[in-house]
Amino acid sequence: MSRSLIERRLTDVSQRLRRVREELALLDEQREVFTDAAEDARVRSLVSETPIAHREYEEAQRHADAMDRSRRLLLGQIAELSATQDELLDRLVVSSD
């Protein structure tokens, strides 16, 4: 692979990695809100002991769980992109020798 192609791919991967990290930061903020809401709903459910409060808790917890799944996916993407970036950097070093 030519040096210029490696550099282009490295730039692309770096930009994608930055975007995914920004998305993760935003998701973490949203996740905190959903987790807090689920915890509040759980406490209300325990205190009120009504079916409606329990359903509200379950719904809030589903949202928090969905955020956790999304976070795991983003972390996986970050790991893949980081590995690709490392591989490209290794190739760049080898091609410059």
Show the residue positions of the predicted features:
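Amphipathic, non-membrane alpha-helical segments in soluble helical-bundle scaffolds
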Residues: 3, 24-31, 75
